């Protein structure tokens, strides 16, 4: 089932639930969720997922869509290559670059078919880039692999549409690689260039702000894994050398008009929600979403609060740190599959295509090429539990000050869900207890 909006908030596979279709075959539960969280885009493919989130309802999508698309280059870039001991946690990287290319290719063809546009097979070139190591080592290796392959380089240079799909450690690797391609003129991003390319990057469970801090001292990481794994924790501090390099790359990419879709996995056992959605980075060309495993989906207060917070970020409204403070409690079991199952969901790829080809009218050229705001960030082992109600109060005050009736109604709905919420686990009960003082503000 897929419920989608211009800027997405929630992605969840729903197992045997009948997918949404033009005939309206969907449970009332999800009709309600769709109505509350945004517009509905039906898809014909029986899927595992639901995408619900936000759009700026005062705007409409720009009409360009598939116009001018004659050639496409799809780059797939896998994440960190773990040793055997951790592959059940991280997932198998070998072949995932090809999988990302294949899934993006299928999603694109489905999208083009919906818009009565057909490209010849040779006009879509898939470029699976593979190579291990630390981030900067990988950037150099993948760059050389790309430019030395004349067919791949030509495909990238001649493409009207460039799509990138990446996962985990592949996120900073991809951003730095794309920044280099932009700086060297291999990618054409100048507005005065009649052959300017449209470029979209899909990051899945990206490790932009590092893994969960509590993983740093784990025996399995310290003993079995080497420099590439330890480097991931350097992203927890925005002042580290590699984090500064990454932010320079983000600045280049986002100010060049590249559209980014950042999808987290709700029960990720490695990458926290705030890290995957780049919570400290602010730019109108970033669309944020979260993937929820079907067995974990509940239409309750917490899920809707996360979706609501993502909706705010997608509309350019501050979430007042809520996503950071909800991330730890949503961590998946260490040997679960939340970190790797995200890239099996086709609609995650479809979301990134829609985000690129159907931007809101409010995303003007000037805004899409503005400098990103890169707030300092440092992950903490322990968070102040009393910050959560202040964050919620901040959201409520900002929404009321804006006077946005759509958001005010959303806030009222969140309050009703809070009142009806009867959490079972200790962690969820603690969240409800912490938010009790701010109930009246909601």
Where are these regions (language model features)?
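Extended, polar/charged low-complexity intrinsically disordered and coiled-coil segments in eukaryotic
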Residues: 1-61, 232-234, 241-255, 259, ...
């Amino acid at each position: 089932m897929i419920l989608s909006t211009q800027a997405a908030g929630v992605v969840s596979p729903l197992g045997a639930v009948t997918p949404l279709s033009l005939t309206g075959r969907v449970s009332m539960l999800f009709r309600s969720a769709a109505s509350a969280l945004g517009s509905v885009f039906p898809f014909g493919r029986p899927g595992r997922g639901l995408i619900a989130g936000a759009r700026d309802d005062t705007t409409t999508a720009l009409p360009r869509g598939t116009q001018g698309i004659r050639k496409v280059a799809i780059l797939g870039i896998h994440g960190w290559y773990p040793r055997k001991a951790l592959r059940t946690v991280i997932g198998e990287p070998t072949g995932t670059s090809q999988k990302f290319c294949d899934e993006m290719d299928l999603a694109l063809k489905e999208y083009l078919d919906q818009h009565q546009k057909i490209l010849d097979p040779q006009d879509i070139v898939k470029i699976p880039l593979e190579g291990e190591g630390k981030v900067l080592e990988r950037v150099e290796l993948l760059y050389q692999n790309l430019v030395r392959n004349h067919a791949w380089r030509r495909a990238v240079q001649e493409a009207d549409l460039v799509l990138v799909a990446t996962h985990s450690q592949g996120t900073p690797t991809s951003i730095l690689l794309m920044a280099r391609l932009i700086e060297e003129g291999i990618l054409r991003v100048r507005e005065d260039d009649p052959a300017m390319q449209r470029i979209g990057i899909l990051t899945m469970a990206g490790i932009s702000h590092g893994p969960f801090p509590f993983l740093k001292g784990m025996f399995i990481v310290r003993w079995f894994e080497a420099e590439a794994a330890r480097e991931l924790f350097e992203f927890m501090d925005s002042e580290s050398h590699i984090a500064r390099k990454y932010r320079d790359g983000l600045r280049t990419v986002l100010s060049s008009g590249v559209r980014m879709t950042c999808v987290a996995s709700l029960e990720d056992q490695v990458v926290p929600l705030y890290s995957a959605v780049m919570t400290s980075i602010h730019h109108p060309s970033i669309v944020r979403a979260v993937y929820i495993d079907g067995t974990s989906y509940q239409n309750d207060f917490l899920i809707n609060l996360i979706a609501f917070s993502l909706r705010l970020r997608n509309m350019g409204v501050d979430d007042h740190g809520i996503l950071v403070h909800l991330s730890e409690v949503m961590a998946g079991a260490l040997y679960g599959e939340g970190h790797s199952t995200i890239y099996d969901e086709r609609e995650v790829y479809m979301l990134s295509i829609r985000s690129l080809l159907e931007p809101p009218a409010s995303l003007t050229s000037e805004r899409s090429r503005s400098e990103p705001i890169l707030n300092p960030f440092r992950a903490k082992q322990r968070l102040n539990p009393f910050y959560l109600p202040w964050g919620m109060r901040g959201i409520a005050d900002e929404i009321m000050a804006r006077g946005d009736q759509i958001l005010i109604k959303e806030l009222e709905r969140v309050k009703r869900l809070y009142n009806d919420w009867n959490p079972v686990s200790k962690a969820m009960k603690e969240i409800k207890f912490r938010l009790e003082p701010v109930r009246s503000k909601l």
